[in-house]
Amino acid sequence: MRLLKTLRLASRDYTHEWQMSACFVLALAAVLGPMLVLFGLKFGVVGGMLNQLIENPENREIRPVSSGRFNQEWFDRMRQHDGVAFLVPRTRSIAATIELNSENSSRIVATELIPSGVGDPLLPADGALPDSITHIVLSQSAAEKLQVGAGDTIDGSATRRYGGRKERAHIDLRVVGVAPTAAFARDGAFADVRLVEALEDYRDGRAVPELGWTGVEDNGARSYPGFRLYASSIYAVSDLKDHLGELGIDVRTKAADIDLVMRMDRNLSAIYWAIAVIGLIGFSLSLGASLWANVDRKRKELSVL
């Protein structure tokens, strides 16, 4: 009962002195206005930039600047790093190519092979993966030139000069999917690492028994000149870059762009909270002083309640 009476008296007093009440509302709006503008800037513009950085896997890619010699033991150790989301070896660029042709097209498409596997950030998470030596995922450009789609079988071939004569080896490849244009804009094919290794071995004159390609037997330990590496998040790129630098591996990343956006986010957050705290304190002091003055002015009226 007392609460209802208090609310009734407060509402009547509020409407009776509507000019003073309107001033309180305007004061609150003056405090909230800049905060809302900064809130929109922080979570709109900067938030959109952060989301773009997070969603684009290219921003998480770490590329070696020059060729090196990386063995399987090195790859096994690097995969244990907390910041590594995806890591596969790369062969020499000149060896990672294959000529593709299909029955639906008269064109022979020279295609770059991209070593891939489970968790490849450039391929859709729910899409097909090249999980076999004869399975590939074509880029949109290559699929259009070959006029093929998922489920089709195409011919792949590679040439070499061996024993003083030119040879060409063929392999039937099954297209298990077509990658989006954003994944790879050129003529390319995502393939199992074993296929990329087999083509390098064939061109170097080594035998590939799994595919029936003859050559010199070589059972020595393999080393790779490069790798495909993606960090688990944009926040892990800088740490991975530093870690690789400690190992003497010079890499190229987009850490500078990531740091710029993150620094903008931190600065706007600091400004936002500083204005919020100062505005809240100022509004509280102003409101308190106004209420104190009103109570003092209405002391006689309040004393008879």
Q: Which residues does each PLM region occupy?
A:
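N-terminal Sec/SRP start-transfer signal
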Residues: 1-36
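Membrane-embedded alpha-helices of multi-pass transport/permease systems
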Residues: 22, 42, 281-302
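Alpha-helical transmembrane segments of integral membrane proteins
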Residues: 23-34, 269-289
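Alpha-helical transmembrane segments
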Residues: 32-59
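Membrane-proximal extracellular/periplasmic loop immediately following the first transmembrane helix
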Residues: 50-101, 107-110, 243
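The feature marks short, hydrophobic/small-residue-biased sequence motifs that occur predominantly
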Residues: 89-132, 190-198
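Basic-flanked hydrophobic alpha-helices used for secretion and membrane insertion
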Residues: 121-124, 137, 148-252
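Peri-transmembrane interface segments
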Residues: 233-282, 294-296, 304
